[in-house]
Amino acid sequence: MAGKQILFREDARRALERGVNALADAVKVTLGPKGRNVVLEKKFGSPQIINDGVSIAREIELADPVENMGAQLVKEVATKTNDVAGDGTTTATVLAQAIIREGLKNVTAGANPMILRKGIEKAVAKAVEEIKAIAKPVETSEAIAQVAAISANDEEIGKLIAEAMEKVGKDGVITVEESQGLGTTLEVVEGMSFDRGYISPYMITDPDKMEAILNDPYILITDKKISAIADLLPILEKVVQTGKPLLIIAEDVEGEALATLVVNKLRGTLTCVAVKAPGFGDRRKAMLEDIAILTNGQVVSEELGFKLENATLSMLGRAKQVRVKKEETIIVGGQGSPEAIEKRIAQIKKQIEETTSDFDREKLQERLAKLAGGVAVIQVGAATETEMKEKKLRIEDALNATRAAVEEGIVAGGGTTYIHIIKALEELEKTATGDERTGIAIVRKALEEPLKQIAINAGLEGSVIVEKVKTLPVGHGFNALTEEYVDMIAAGIVDPAKVTRSALQNAASVAAMLLTTEALVAEKPEKEKKGPDMPNMDMM
């Protein structure tokens, strides 16, 4: 059995720092408009060329187990920031490295790590307060496009995401898929769609497209399996008198009930399409209820005391149009009351906040989008697979950044906001003493690092630019692309406040923990066994 190695004090902290630096140095070359790419080896397929901090961090495993612990800690900073805000992972890594570097200098010089940590936490709380105070809400489509363009480093992508958000609303679902073509396009599926199609192909109205289109139909929603025609007859007769088509959403329609519907359709007495209810179990009940609210109908369920044979026209939902394909049903223009839909949306949002399961959250978000007005699909195309994967990652990042911006507003980008909150930390420093004051100073100094790194990646002297930006009015900063000093928000160089805040909070959290390390236990690296020597050439 391999023994463990134990390192203490300075040795432990320095070994961790080497790991932190190895990971951070690989990630930080991607920061800013002139950041470079990193190539990742893939065991299968071609290497991946990317610009996304968290994807690079995830790939890094160091050979030395102690250094690897340091790298894994910083990886957590990037991953956590990605989970919370979906972007800003490189910034978070750069901040963590700076806080660790400055903090270790002070610990080596004899500062008490526990008190330093207190100072760091105080400084971060103050900084977050300042970020929230200067954040501007995002209202226009242009502002959304700017946020997305900065995150993806591409104006076209910015416009595409802004257009998608405009079409499906802030709560709509926007998915990113790989396309076969060269260009990147946007498709919007309006209305509520679910993945169930017609039960019988005899129900189609358009044989060329193999789909059924019902205009201004009645919609019967039930959680029952319908097999006896006697259950359906009363409501069918009422619908026939109106001359409108009928959509039936039920657990299943079979036997004589299905045969009757098909015969009526073929004779032209009643245009009717039956589809199975979406989802399973409790989720099915919830989705049927969503459809009922969207179309101003009721779920005809014996659990609620309604029998199918007693159903009336007022219990049926209405919509402008329903399109039913082989495996999909789309309800467009449901006639539910906006207040009822709003209430339902608020209820689902509450459930999203409270759920702990990622799967449930994803399903709830899908339901929310379907109620809120549709689904947009961005089809990513490129000349090669390597380029397409890189582009898809950037679009996903930009999408996350945009959602974060809508949630908590925007601040000046390019590391500028961090520079302008330094003043508030200087004031805070005056009120503290001893090692706590040093902790605040560590964060104050670390806040310069993102801008410095952006400048270095643009081939300039970082500290000169930082000093110059400190003298500019709040909101003015350095545009690394044109190498000019500008009003950042007016120039469209913005970051979501949520990303700026999360990056700092997560970086400080992990860095402060690392500073308080006094001992470290790790596996001993195993020595590779030597194989037998080559035989002497004389013996050949």
Swiss-Prot record:
It is found in: Cytoplasm. GO terms for molecular function: ATP binding; ATP-dependent protein folding chaperone; isomerase activity; unfolded protein binding. Pfam families: Cpn60_TCP1. The keyword Isomerase applies. InterPro entries: Chaperonin_Cpn60_CS, Cpn60/GroEL, Cpn60/GroEL/TCP-1, GroEL-like_apical_dom_sf, GROEL-like_equatorial_sf, TCP-1-like_intermed_sf. Forms a cylinder of 14 subunits composed of two heptameric rings stacked back-to-back. Interacts with the co-chaperonin GroES. This is Chaperonin GroEL. Together with its co-chaperonin GroES, plays an essential role in assisting protein folding. The GroEL-GroES system forms a nano-cage that allows encapsulation of the non-native substrate proteins and provides a physical environment optimized to promote and accelerate protein folding. HAMAP family: CH60 (MF_00600). It is an enzyme of class 5 (isomerase). CDD domains: GroEL. One of its GO terms (biological process) is protein refolding. The gene is groEL. Keywords: ATP-binding, Chaperone, Cytoplasm, Isomerase, Nucleotide-binding. The lineage of its organism: Bacteria, Bacillati, Bacillota, Clostridia, Thermoanaerobacterales. It comes from Carboxydothermus hydrogenoformans (strain ATCC BAA-161 / DSM 6008 / Z-2901). Belongs to the chaperonin (HSP60) family. It catalyses: ATP + H2O + a folded polypeptide = ADP + phosphate + an unfolded polypeptide. It comes from the Bacteria.
